[in-house]
Amino acid sequence: MDRYVLRPNDPHLWAMYKKAVASFWTVEEVDLSTDVRHWTDKLTEAERRFMSHILAFFAMADGIVGDNLVCNFAKELDHIPEARAFYGFQVAIENIHAEMYTQLIITLVAKENQAALFSAAEDMPCVKAKAQWAAQWLNATHKPIATRLLAFAAVEGVMFSGSFAAIFWLKKRSLMPGLAFSNELISRDEGLHCDFACMLFRQMANKPCQDDAHQIISDAVDIETAFFREALKTPLLGMNSDSMKLYIQFVADRLLDALGYAKMYNVSNPFDFMDNISIEGKTNFFERRVSEYQRMGVFTPSSMEFTMNEEF
């Protein structure tokens, strides 16, 4: 019965949970009124097509991540109090992300086109490939937990990264402020989720060998690259499938390094507008207050004591 008592053992994992709580936000705090006009009057048809692909993927992606947490990780790791707390909160945050993407589609996309985006996981091949890869790991409960933790770090750390960058590209051009703001909040959340996965992974036994880890990351990179070849059939000013491929490889190397493996691609970041934004949380992106959404008092000193005696 002791596992029902929330008594943290690892101050670093617990700090991740407290950071997540401090970053809570809601869909109602995002103003999309200007975005409606920008979507119609300022984005080109090619840009709307590109963003529609991204929204179609995101509309279902958080549901798969949430299912994995509820069905697998939260149960398998419930002996670790920090993981139990973090994953419980992450499920709520993934629901907010899913709600946000639904609201974006309903608000921005013409009504006759919305159904196609909501069913993209079945009907849009490049989105379906991403969904199937993530679902494959959702159902791979015969695989070691460390291997699946790595795979879902790839989902959130690689398969989300290009789409986040695409929306930051709009922000650089002062377009779609509501979408850009929600993207800042969501990418911050997902970066924290990925950081937590990496921290937990490094403490686990029975990690996959480097060849297996490289294969998982390589598969994620290939599927993500194929997605952008389809989404970016028409090159855009400052955004094309070749530069996106380099960015995805760059992010994959950062993730491999955070997980404790050798890099695979050794490429530079092709997007100057992403230089100060690390999806893996390597900069102070999570330390600063993002538009004053960090809840006051969450990081105040606590009387709770920590011990470093947990076995992983």
Swiss-Prot record:
GO BP annotation list: deoxyribonucleotide biosynthetic process
Catalytic activities: a 2'-deoxyribonucleoside 5'-diphosphate + [thioredoxin]-disulfide + H2O = a ribonucleoside 5'-diphosphate + [thioredoxin]-dithiol
Signal peptide: none
Protein's UniProt keywords contain Iron: yes
EC number: 1.17.4.1
Molecular function GO labels: metal ion binding; ribonucleoside-diphosphate reductase activity, thioredoxin disulfide as acceptor
Gene3D superfamilies: Ribonucleotide Reductase, subunit A (1.10.620.20)
Cofactor binding summary note: Binds 2 iron ions per subunit.
Keywords on record: Deoxyribonucleotide synthesis, Iron, Metal-binding, Oxidoreductase
Active site per UniProt: Y101
Requisite cofactors: Fe cation
Short name of any one Pfam family annotated for the protein: Ribonuc_red_sm
Binding site for Fe cation 1: D62, E94, H97
Binding positions (Fe cation 2): E94, E156, E190, H193
Keyword Oxidoreductase belongs to the record: yes
Function: Ribonucleoside-diphosphate reductase holoenzyme provides the precursors necessary for viral DNA synthesis. Allows virus growth in non-dividing cells. Catalyzes the biosynthesis of deoxyribonucleotides from the corresponding ribonucleotides.
Entry-linked PANTHER family: RIBONUCLEOSIDE-DIPHOSPHATE REDUCTASE SMALL CHAIN, RIBONUCLEOSIDE-DIPHOSPHATE REDUCTASE SUBUNIT M2
Oligomeric form and interacting partners: Heterodimer of a large and a small chain.
Family of the protein in this entry: Belongs to the ribonucleoside diphosphate reductase small chain family.
This protein's name: Ribonucleoside-diphosphate reductase small chain
Gene source species: Red sea bream iridovirus (RSIV)
